[in-house]
């Protein structure tokens, strides 16, 4: 990767030098100056300065300075900035023109993107949080989803596997609204529903739509909230080139303190006297962890004229992970072109393309038996008194207790390669028939092709038993979207009316194929020569389609900036459902009252906005598989005599009554702005009740089918959110702004099939598969379920209400609560032992600027919420290495301890391994410096910013695991909703140090 990165850097520098030469030209007349605000005297960065009547222009730098060439003294400079009155000045004989822009009270307000349109922030009647480009790029992140963490109240962002390069990231808004369907937020990029996120540097703004009033316009897909992403566009100015590049070093945030070789030998000999200590003393975590790195470079070219605008951006991202042999390389390109054909006719095209290549390592995988484990869990458990190699050069294998693969061999010998190509194009045309009445049509298409190749050689346990195993998988998803809608906006005195009506058609097609082989004569073939395997694995393939047709509408009415009414409705029809429930209707309504505009407050010097909001509506979740309503059959065969007879067997009954899960949400909110918007506060209280949850209902054995998916459950989310944004200090040399958000969400099951408890297994196919969690009416989703640990048994009679498990009744064993009082511990003694849902989450951001220096300080916190640490449970089982606290284990001479005696124990779910997952983390600390205009001189550069930053620098927590943000990877919807708060063998989280450069010319 180093050579490749060097080549990339050289290429970028070469382009940079060429472009500097291209833009240096003869000057007819040069004008410079400073642009400031009339309100507070602050310098205004990013002001558009255009030579009127031409495409020539520039923008003011971070300190409000600008420099522009004009053809002659008759030229007129036009100064344009959002929220301020446009000003025009004739150049004449002047060479220095400093401008004070006046605040435009009519345009000052922030514009918020909502479904199929935009509104002024003051006219929003629903619950919407906005995240701007500067916040998303305040520090380097691997994805835009990660940059969203802690930035908006009510939004939970979590990696599917710690700091793994390319790990999927889940975004949840106001908790999970489903059990067996998806609870992930819907992502809409430039109007394309279901698009993948662009790079953070290409995003202009991001709006999080949270309540039903805001999300009902997306109907059956809006139950989990909507994230509206708007990418950057060109401006009517001279061409501008931006280069943003950074290089990061990454280190493992935290390791687990384990027994060394001598301690391990003493530990094993305590219950296995014949154990002979090995010859080595290996720190296996040190063997698989390394210093990671990230190289991230973006080059963006933008500009335009009065009639056309363009923005073209390319991004190169390369990451070497902190686990050896794990990396990711990604290229993306984004293009936005907007053209005004006439005053009333506009067209535009958005194109996105990307390729990613990922080399992964096995994590959170099956352990024990022939599975052998994964890289992370094996590093924790592998005997420390063994080295990497045997005397004959082969890899060592842990064969005492659980069979465990050599973690170094797993990381370096196994192959897990993924290549994904993503393309998206979205075209629009808009025609304004009369003032305020516009028709817009869009057509978009996206395709994502993924290839996954894996090889398990004979040098690891999973491959040794089958002579090596190679698999290859192909997946393709295409998404076609066509939308047509009319908008009408009209003002009648103090009355403002906005109407929207439209039609949408979307088709998603998924196809894929799988092939594999075993028993290879050599490990050199990998997965690209499947015919080299003597044994062919069962191949498979699939093809499915989903079509969604919709009509939608919205009415916004606002009177005198005081009273706001919104009604939204959408009717969806999906091919996934049968004729009985093919269509569903999702309405919502909202009202808002800006009390600050009333006569008794409008002259207040303190209160700028005091807006009460209320909304109620219904949204849906259509996440059932295509053909789920149909009867299903599987092929079978039998041998009759000497002939094979083929046939089919019924595996699922048809269900014509399946329908959407529906979430009904009430939201009550208050938005306050004080002191000319210097202090902004927002509060929301909400309840979300999801009905018709999809659950498998058990069927009688005589039916021949084990269960059937039916709509028979209900759950509820309740919570509140609070956010503050303040400009604490604003003067010419120093500014300080603060943003704080606070969220609390609690959920519970309201209704289950027949009222019965449902036990949730974790880690399917894993030797750790256990009933870890429970769904019970009135209790939190995913509550941990197991035995209540009561300490170490000291001998004699059991303390009242306690007992030991069978086979562990000697002194030093584990004591548990005997709930049924029969003197024995059985499954009847299990209870709810923890709730994985945090009590509340917080984000606290500070931006400071002094002259040319800037600093960002960002904290993120989660308080409450337990974690079941599978890793520590496994390490405490006695079947492999253990944690360092085992040196303080119970013994006849060390009875004053809470660590049980060394022994091989069954891996049971107990409260001993349930921990408080609270933490406060310094998510980012960055320092930047903008080179002054006087230094840049005649270079052609507008701005140059140098910065250094650190992420995850400090973490305050009592959690004993590797990281409190750990999350067990779940690849299906059910377990991603219920197997929350599990920590097992996750790819480690990282601490990152970055140096970066931003240039604009």
UniProtKB/Swiss-Prot annotation:
Disulfide bonds: none annotated. Residues 120-232 form the TBDR plug domain. Pfam families: CarbopepD_reg_2, Plug, TonB_dep_Rec_b-barrel. This is TonB-dependent receptor P3. Residues 1-26 form the signal peptide. It is found in: Cell outer membrane. NCBIfam families: OMP_RagA_SusC, SusC_RagA_signa. Belongs to the TonB-dependent receptor family. Induction: By ulvan and rhamnose. TonB-dependent receptor probably involved in ulvan degradation. Ulvan is the main polysaccharide component of the Ulvales (green seaweed) cell wall. It is composed of disaccharide building blocks comprising 3-sulfated rhamnose (Rha3S) linked to D-glucuronic acid (GlcA), L-iduronic acid (IduA), or D-xylose (Xyl). The TonB-dependent receptor may mediate transport of ulvan oligosaccharides from the surface of the outer membrane to the periplasm for subsequent degradation. It comes from Formosa agariphila (strain DSM 15362 / KCTC 12365 / LMG 23005 / KMM 3901 / M-2Alg 35-1). It comes from the Bacteria.
């Amino acid at each position: 990767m180093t050579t490749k990165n060097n080549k990339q850097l050289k290429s970028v520098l070469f382009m940079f030098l060429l472009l500097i030469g291209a833009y240096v030209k003869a000057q007819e007349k040069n004008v410079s100056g400073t642009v400031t605000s009339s309100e507070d005297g602050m310098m205004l960065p990013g002001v558009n300065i255009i030579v009127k009547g031409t495409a020539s222009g520039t923008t003011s730098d971070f300190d409000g300075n600008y420099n522009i060439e004009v053809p002659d003294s008759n030229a007129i400079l036009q100064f344009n900035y959002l929220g301020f009155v446009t000003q025009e000045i004739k150049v004449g004989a002047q060479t220095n023109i400093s401008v004070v822009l006046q605040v435009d009270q009519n345009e000052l307000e922030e514009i918020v993107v909502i479904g199929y349109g935009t509104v002024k922030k003051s006219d929003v009647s629903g619950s919407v949080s906005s995240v701007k480009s500067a916040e998303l790029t305040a520090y380097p992140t691997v994805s835009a989803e990660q940059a969203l963490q802690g930035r908006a109240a009510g939004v939970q962002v979590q990696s599917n596997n710690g700091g793994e390069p390319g790990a999927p990231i889940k975004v949840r808004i106001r908790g999970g609204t489903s059990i067996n369907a998806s609870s992930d937020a819907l992502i809409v990029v430039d109007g394309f529903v279901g698009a993948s996120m662009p790079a953070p540097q290409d995003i202009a703004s991001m709006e999080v739509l949270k309540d039903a009033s805001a999300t009902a316009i997306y109907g059956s897909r809006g139950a989990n909230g909507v994230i509206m992403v708007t990418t950057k566009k060109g401006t009517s100015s001279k061409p501008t080139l931006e280069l943003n590049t950074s290089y990061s070093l990454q280190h493992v945030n935290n390791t687990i303190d384990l027994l060394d070789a001598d301690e391990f030998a003493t530990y094993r000999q305590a219950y296995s006297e014949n154990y002979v200590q090995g010859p080595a003393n290996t720190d296996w975590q040190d063997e698989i962890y390394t210093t990671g790195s990230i190289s991230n470079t973006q080059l963006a070219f933008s500009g335009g004229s009065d009639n056309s605008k363009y923005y073209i951006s390319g991004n190169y991202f390369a990451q070497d992970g902190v686990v050896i042999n794990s990396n990711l390389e990604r290229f993306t390109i984004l293009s936005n072109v907007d053209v005004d054909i006439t005053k009333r006719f506009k067209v535009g095209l958005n194109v996105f393309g990307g390729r990613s290549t990922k080399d992964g390592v096995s994590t959170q995988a099956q352990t024990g038996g022939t599975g052998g484990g994964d890289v992370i869990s094996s590093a924790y458990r592998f005997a420390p008194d063994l080295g990497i190699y045997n005397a004959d050069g082969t890899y060592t294998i842990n064969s005492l207790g659980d069979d465990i693969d050599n973690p170094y061999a797993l990381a370096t010998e196994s192959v897990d390669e993924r290549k994904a190509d993503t393309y998206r194009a979205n075209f629009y045309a808009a025609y304004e028939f009369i003032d305020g009445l516009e028709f817009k049509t869009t057509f978009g298409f996206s395709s994502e092709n993924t290839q996954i190749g894996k090889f398990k050689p004979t040098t690891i346990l999973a491959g040794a038993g089958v002579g090596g195993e190679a698999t290859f998988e192909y997946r393709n998803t295409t998404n076609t979207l066509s939308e047509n809608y009319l908008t009408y906006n009209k003002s009648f005195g103090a009355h403002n009316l906005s109407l929207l009506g439209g039609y949408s058609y979307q088709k998603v097609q998924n196809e894929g194929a799988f092939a594999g082989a075993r028993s290879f004569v050599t490990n050199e073939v990998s997965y690209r020569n499947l015919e080299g395997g003597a044994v062919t694995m069962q191949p498979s393939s699939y093809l499915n389609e989903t079509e969604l047709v919709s009509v939608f509408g919205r009415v916004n009415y606002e009177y005198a900036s005081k009273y706001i009414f919104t009604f939204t409705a959408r009717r969806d029809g999906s091919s996934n459902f049968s004729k009985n429930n093919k269509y569903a209707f999702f309405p919502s309504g909202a009202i808002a009252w800006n009390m600050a505009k009333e006569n008794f407050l409008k002259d207040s010097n303190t209160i700028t906005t005091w807006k009460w909001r209320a909304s109620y509506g219904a949204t849906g979740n259509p996440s059932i598989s295509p053909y789920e309503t149909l009867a299903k059959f599987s092929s079978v065969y039998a041998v009759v005599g000497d002939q094979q007879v083929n046939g089919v067997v019924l595996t699922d009954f048809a269900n014509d009554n399946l329908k959407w899960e529906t979430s009904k949400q009430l939201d009550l909110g208050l938005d306050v702005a004080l002191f000319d918007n210097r202090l902004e506060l927002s509060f929301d209280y909400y309840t979300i009740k999801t009905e018709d949850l999809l659950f498998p209902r058990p069927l009688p054995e005589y039916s021949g089918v084990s269960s059937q998916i039916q709509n028979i459950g209900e759950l509820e989310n309740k919570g509140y959110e609070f956010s503050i944004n303040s400009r604490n200090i604003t003067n010419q040399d120093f500014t300080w702004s603060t943003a704080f958000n606070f969220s609390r969400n609690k959920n519970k099951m309201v209704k289950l099939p027949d009222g019965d408890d449902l036990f949730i297994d974790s880690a399917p196919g894993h030797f750790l598969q256990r009933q870890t969690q429970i769904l019970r009416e009135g209790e939190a989703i995913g509550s941990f379920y197991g035995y209540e640990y009561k300490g170490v048994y000291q001998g004699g009679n059991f303390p009242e209400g306690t007992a030991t498990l069978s086979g562990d009744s000697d002194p030093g064993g584990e004591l548990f609560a005997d709930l049924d009082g029969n003197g024995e511990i059985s499954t009847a003694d299990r209870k709810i032992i923890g709730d994985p849902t945090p009590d509340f989450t917080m984000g606290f951001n500070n931006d400071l600027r002094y002259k040319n220096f800037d600093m960002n300080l960002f904290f993120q916190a989660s308080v409450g919420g337990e974690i079941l640490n599978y890793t520590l449970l496994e390490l405490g089982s006695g079947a492999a290495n253990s944690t360092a606290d085992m040196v303080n284990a119970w013994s006849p001479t060390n009875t004053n301890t809470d660590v049980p005696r060394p022994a091989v124990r069954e891996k049971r779910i107990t409260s001993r391994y349930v921990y408080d997952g609270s933490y406060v983390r310094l998510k980012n600390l960055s320092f930047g410096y903008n080179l002054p205009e006087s230094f840049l001189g005649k270079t052609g550069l507008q701005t140059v910013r140098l910065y250094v930053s650190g992420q995850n620098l400090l973490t305050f927590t009592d959690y004993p695991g590797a990281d409190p943000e750990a999350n067990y990877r779940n690849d299906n919807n059910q377990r991603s909703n219920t197997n929350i708060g599990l920590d097992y063998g996750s790819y480690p989280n990282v601490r990152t140090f970055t140096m970066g450069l931003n240039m604009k010319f």
